[in-house]
């Protein structure tokens, strides 16, 4: 508010001292610009002094001539005009034409062209020197760059780490078929694992020892990790005399009576092996037991799919005891 009051007082003083009074438009303009800042108020006061100096002739001058008079009076005669020879003496870099300034290094005969004295351009040196002939020269190099390069000697692990996410398939192909086989076996094992995790798990691949361990609460390995019977045991069983087989055929009822306590195995056996059920009254000879063991091994080597729900409890049998003896 103080600056506004000072501007109004200055404008009143200028109006009273002038030969002609300011109109309402000029007064508002003078008041507004005088209230912006102290420097603006000083400029407006200097302009009023110039107008007072010229008197009534100031109103008859064209606006362009008024601006020229104001600029000349405000700057002062001491300011040098552009192109003044005194300026060239103070700034020797402005003497020579741009882009042709040569720099000499002391007393030695070393000269170079000043790169900063060149005319300004938005383009770089490579863009200014670009031509069609440079393209024709670079064509053979581009064609050689497009040719397949020999594989690098870096290890495969580092190549797989350096490969970007977009080029993952190319890095996998470079690792070779061994890696693909590894990945295939990995997914196969996962599929076998997930097969035995659901509520409708299949128990046809479980051995009696695995069933017993499940009843005890121990962790059972899946079928893909189970060790197959040794070839020596197979050969020994194959070399057994044929009279055992004949005894097995002669007494089918005894074998069915031994198999009766296993409900899951009774369902899995073919209908030809099922015989009339009866109470176990006679003791079983060891030869017949060995024959039954051979049948059990044959059943587990070639499993038949059995639909067993998870709610059923598989009972412990004598075969389980003999298997873990």
From Swiss-Prot:
Main location: cytoplasm
Entry's Gene Ontology cellular component terms: cytoplasm
Positions with biased composition (Polar residues): 133-144
Keywords, alphabetical: Acetylation, Cytoplasm, Phosphoprotein
Chain spans, region Disordered: 1-21, 76-100, 133-177, 190-285
Compositional bias annotation for Low complexity: 1-18, 261-281
Keyword Phosphoprotein on entry: yes
Pfam families to which the protein is assigned, alphabetical: DUF4706
Subcellular location: Cytoplasm
PTM annotation (N-acetylalanine): residues: 2
Modified residues (Phosphoserine): 37, 126, 171, 285
Compositional bias segments (type: Basic and acidic residues): 229-248
Superkingdom field: Eukaryota
Cited InterPro entries: DUF4706 (IPR031600)
Protein name, per record: Uncharacterized protein C1orf198 homolog
Organism: Bos taurus
């Amino acid at each position: 508010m103080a600056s506004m009051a000072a501007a109004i007082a200055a404008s009143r003083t200028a109006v009273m001292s002038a030969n002609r009074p300011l109109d309402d438009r000029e007064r508002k303009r003078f008041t507004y610009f005088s209230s912006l800042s102290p420097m603006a108020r000083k400029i407006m006061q200097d302009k009023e002094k110039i107008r007072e100096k010229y008197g009534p002739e100031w109103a008859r001058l064209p606006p362009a001539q008024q601006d020229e008079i104001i600029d000349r009076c405000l700057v002062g005669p001491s300011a040098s005009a552009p192109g003044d020879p005194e300026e060239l003496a103070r700034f020797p870099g402005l003497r020579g034409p741009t882009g042709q300034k040569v720099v000499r290094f002391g007393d030695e005969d070393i000269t170079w062209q000043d790169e900063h004295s060149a005319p300004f351009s938005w383009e770089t040196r490579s863009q200014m020197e670009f031509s069609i002939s440079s393209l024709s020269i670079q064509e053979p190099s581009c064609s050689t760059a497009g040719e397949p390069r020999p594989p690098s000697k870096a290890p495969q692990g580092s190549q797989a780490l350096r490969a970007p996410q977009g080029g993952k398939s190319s890095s996998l192909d470079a690792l070779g078929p061994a890696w693909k086989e590894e990945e295939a076996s990995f997914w196969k094992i996962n599929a076998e694992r997930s097969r035995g995790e659901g509520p409708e798990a299949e128990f046809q691949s479980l051995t009696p020892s695995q069933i017993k361990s499940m009843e005890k609460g121990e962790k059972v390995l899946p079928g893909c990790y189970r060790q197959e019977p040794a070839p020596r045991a197979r050969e020994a069983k194959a070399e057994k005399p044929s009279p055992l087989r004949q005894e097995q055929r002669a007494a089918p009822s005894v074998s069915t009576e031994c198999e009766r306590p296993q409900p899951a195995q009774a369902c899995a056996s073919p209908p030809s092996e099922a015989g009339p059920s009866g109470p176990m009254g006679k003791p079983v000879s060891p030869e017949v037991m060995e024959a039954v063991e051979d049948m059990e091994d044959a059943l587990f080597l070639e499993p038949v799919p059995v639909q067993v729900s998870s709610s059923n409890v598989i009972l412990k049998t004598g075969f389980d005891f003999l298997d873990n003896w």
